[in-house]
């Protein structure tokens, strides 16, 4: 499974034996080539990205449009940065999404990004106000890989950092979210600190070699002890038995029907 939160949920609330579960998240290289990434001054604007058919993404777009972005834009105008824009990317934008586009408000619904990494690297801050959802969030992985600090929620960081400091900020209410977004857009030293924390998460929590070796070790153990593992899995045996029984009775029904 790619999410340690879901593993804990299955064990704690559904009593799934730990030996039936294995944690292997998205994998990342150990080191990001920071020198190849645009620095703070070379970046501009905010970015939000995600498939419009995914309900948590659509909900976050609506929250940005109707509450968060107007507040962010107003605060940036006060500090002399009224030119900041929010660019929203995602596949399958329906008419109700494209109708939200308003260049005068700095709210740009751009639809599909031909190069998601390029647009993420060009942005200064990633906004991901997810109010529900689960699993690893690809947009936040991409943001860390591109050196773009992200402002998200407790749902957003779920299964994303292993307790390490987040590479950006975590806020569940509108005012705290807006304050964090403005601060990260405005203060270069804060931005650099959070960028490095994102790199640390990739290095220490999603490192490819560590998880790959663990997966290889587990598969080898299963291969060498397959009968024992299957014998210890009572529920699995029961489900397998009844699955075979269903095909048995289906076969008998077909035979009777064809007589």
Task: Mark where each language-model region is.
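Short acidic/histidine- and often glycine-rich active-site loop of Leloir-type glycosyltransferases
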Residues: 154-170
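Conserved acidic donor-binding segment of nucleotide-sugar-dependent glycosyltransferases
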Residues: 167-175, 183-188
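C-terminal amphipathic helix plus adjacent low-complexity
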Residues: 190-192, 197-259
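Short hydrophobic beta-strand element within catalytic cores of glycosyltransferases
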Residues: 139-142, 149-153
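Acidic donor-binding loop of glycosyltransferase active sites
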Residues: 118-135, 148
């Amino acid at each position: 499974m790619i999410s340690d939160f879901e593993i804990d949920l299955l064990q704690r609330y559904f009593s799934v034996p730990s030996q039936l579960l294995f944690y292997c998240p998205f994998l990342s290289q150990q080191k990001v080539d920071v020198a190849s990434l645009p620095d703070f001054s070379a970046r501009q604007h905010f970015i939000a990205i995600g498939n419009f058919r995914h309900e948590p993404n659509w909900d976050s777009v609506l929250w940005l449009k109707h509450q968060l972005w107007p507040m962010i834009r107003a605060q940036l105008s006060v500090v002399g940065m009224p030119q900041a824009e929010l660019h929203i990317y995602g596949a399958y934008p329906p008419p109700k999404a494209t109708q939200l586009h308003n260049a005068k408000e700095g709210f740009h619904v751009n639809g599909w990004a031909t190069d998601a990494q390029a647009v993420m690297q060009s942005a200064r801050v990633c906004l991901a106000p997810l109010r529900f959802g689960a699993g690893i969030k690809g947009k936040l992985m991409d943001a860390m890989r591109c050196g773009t600090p992200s402002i998200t929620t407790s749902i957003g960081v779920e299964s994303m950092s292993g307790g390490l400091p987040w590479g950006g900020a975590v806020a569940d209410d509108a005012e705290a979210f807006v304050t964090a977004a403005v601060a990260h857009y405005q203060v270069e030293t804060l931005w650099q600190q959070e960028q490095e924390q994102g790199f640390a998460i990739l290095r220490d929590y999603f490192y490819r070699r560590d998880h790959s070796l663990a997966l290889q070790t587990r598969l080898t153990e299963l291969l060498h002890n397959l009968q024992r593992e299957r014998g210890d899995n009572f529920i699995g045996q029961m489900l397998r038995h009844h699955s075979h029984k269903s095909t048995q009775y289906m076969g008998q029904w077909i035979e009777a029907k064809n007589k």
